[in-house]
Amino acid sequence: MTAVRAPRRRASGDVQGGFDFSRPDEIVCGVDEAGRGPLAGPVVAAAVILDPAQPIDGLDDSKVLSAKKRDALYDLIVTRSHAYCVASASVDEIDTLNILHATMLAMKRAVEGLSVLPTLAQIDGNRCPTLSVRAEAIVSGDALVPSISAASILAKVTRDRMLVDLHERFPVYGFNVHAGYGTAKHLAALREHGPCEAHRRSFAPVRAALDLIR
């Protein structure tokens, strides 16, 4: 599937929230993920259909927002959206399928878990999961399409909270600080303690740490 390179501006005109008023039968959801790159924890995806009657100011790519701003927007999104769903693929699924296919699986679960069936799913990035509804990939969609921005925020906040919970179980790795990414301190902890069950053994730094303790 060819990815859509959207113009560097927010959608406007007849498209508001998840509804295209030039086509009353069109219901659009935005989809994004968080956690493809980390060495530990699940990959999380979210799908959001915004409600044009309850606009949300400040939506943007979750990566450019502060944690405080993301948390505030998270509360608004789950309260004001027409529908939303957050789903994940586990570490075992990542290691079995690979991270790309696990990400597609999490996205598929998020779209299929919506309480309202969309007619179009707009996916951040350059490829789409196999869905029962039409889908289009939008490069940099998390910075361009409000519903994708909302999905990126839900996915990021949810995953960060999951990693805080993992920190309670495995405090030596500092998951609450780096969310599983391969920081210098995380890599040092991997070398010292070896991987835990939350680490992705299909990722090279984790395999290298395993080799050290064999």
From Swiss-Prot:
Name under which the protein is recorded: Ribonuclease HII
Gene assigned in the entry: rnhB
Record GO cellular component, one term: cytoplasm
Cofactor binding comment, as recorded: Manganese or magnesium. Binds 1 divalent metal ion per monomer in the absence of substrate. May bind a second metal ion after substrate binding.
Residues involved in a divalent metal cation binding: 32-33, 124
Role: Endonuclease that specifically degrades the RNA of RNA-DNA hybrids.
Spans through the membrane: none
Source species: Burkholderia orbicola (strain MC0-3)
Keywords for the protein's UniProt record, in alphabetical order: Cytoplasm, Endonuclease, Hydrolase, Manganese, Metal-binding, Nuclease
